[in-house]
Amino acid sequence: MLLAACTVEPLATSSSDSTLSTGLAGQATSEVLSGISVAPVKTRVAQQVRNRLLFAMNGGELKPGGQYEVVLSVSERSQTLAVEGDSLTATAARVIVLVSYDLVDVNTKKVVAAGRRQSVASFDRTPQSFANQRAEREAQDRAAREVAQQLRLAVAQDIASL
């Protein structure tokens, strides 16, 4: 009997009896997410985050007439984690991708929700510069993929609370 007041629902439900709030009554979260656009970005890592987020929200097919837009601000940096004793050569590093987002109502241009998410991916360094560049780029891509999933969940929670 303690669970009688429980209102937990899956975020990706497509059931027609699922409502998110009075403003979005009758629309499942997945339907609302599929109509959200993501503003263009400028850097390679930001583009990776944007592409992954778009695909996670709508499978790459944006429904026209969406009510919301996600505006991303993406920063990325690398940090050395370990160095070789005598030569002080970096042997391990990590990439940190930090994303701030605003969920904007397209009609009123007002920010209805905002947040920050980050992801970290580690990689090994070698004496070969090309291998280091590839390892860092792959770490950036892994971090971008992870933070995009975090953003999808955050935006879904924001939509559900409207």
Regions found by a protein language model. Give the residues of each.
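C-terminal/domain-edge helix-coil "capping" segments
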Residues: 134-162
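Surface-exposed short loop/turn segments
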Residues: 55, 60-67, 71-114, 121-138
